[in-house]
């Protein structure tokens, strides 16, 4: 008789019971409460970013599989898993579109607030992986000039560089990229190696930043030297990722035009994609046929939207983006005069983050504006 398997799953994984229950008994726990005792007799562990998966957690456990439904890897001791032959899967790319849409929304908000035309600015994208390439794709659709910096990709894809150069899409040095009007970072956090990204935007490099420039970090805390960043005069900072979360830096917090609690990749679609990717891989490891009955539990699609045209195309798009996800609400949700209160709000908002859907889930009614129709279609909206 086959024993029923036990799966310990972070309770922030959406639809955990609906997706995973046919594989065994599902036990959900807050990520920070998953400890050695809770996984001791479990067969699978599925986490987000709040659980440190290492020897102290797993050494006396029966865990046969570890899955992470988020893209970051700094909470996973992959060396330990490999040494003990524990299969591991991370949902790389699951939230890339969500983060890219957050960046584009922030760009349009900044442009309207500071009264500049995005088509007259240059966007420097540092890190052109799953997220960065989508940011570039969407930005170029919207007529924004981009500079791309990604040394690991540049080295790994030398044959592609000739074709990319012909399209005007070749990589540039970090020094050149940092001359862009707006800088957005999309690298992993790596602390060693030839291309380490810890303090990639170092105190020395921050001295080169000019007061008209904008810095966005929706990648990882630690990529930008936070102490030096506080002393750097910029037009604006948009910060979604911080060192030592949720105990974010009070001085840096005060500099942010938009301060959000690491939620750029938190669309419902991104979370479901992460769960699904891990689920399908676990089914493969356990030789089980995947099921899709969980889909009937999803919320209905958003109500169709009518576009209210503004005086400019940029203003029209900004208003539409705010209809789909108003990032100012994310900022206001953690704002407080007392930094200790900010820290409390930070964690609470992440755990109780409101549901929002990505652009491809939204139906938009556009009349008598072929250019707007084409642009929205290229961005993934459903046109009616």
Language-model features: where?
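Phosphate/diphosphate ligand-binding glycine-rich loop within oxidoreductases
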Residues: 10, 44-116
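Short, polar loop motifs at secondary-structure junctions
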Residues: 10-16, 31-34, 49-52, 150-155, ...
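Phosphate-coordination loops involved in phosphoryl transfer and adenosine-cofactor binding
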Residues: 3-4, 119-122, 212
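NAD(P)-binding Rossmann-fold cofactor-contacting core
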Residues: 14, 141-162
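Rossmann-like adenosine-cofactor binding region
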Residues: 53-54, 155-250, 379
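Rossmann-like dinucleotide-binding domain for NAD(H)/NADP(H)
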Residues: 212-374, 379-383
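Glycine-rich adenosine-cofactor-binding loop
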Residues: 10-11, 92, 100, 119-140
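N-terminal glycine-/charge-rich "phosphate-binding" loop or analogous flexible N-terminal tail
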Residues: 1-42
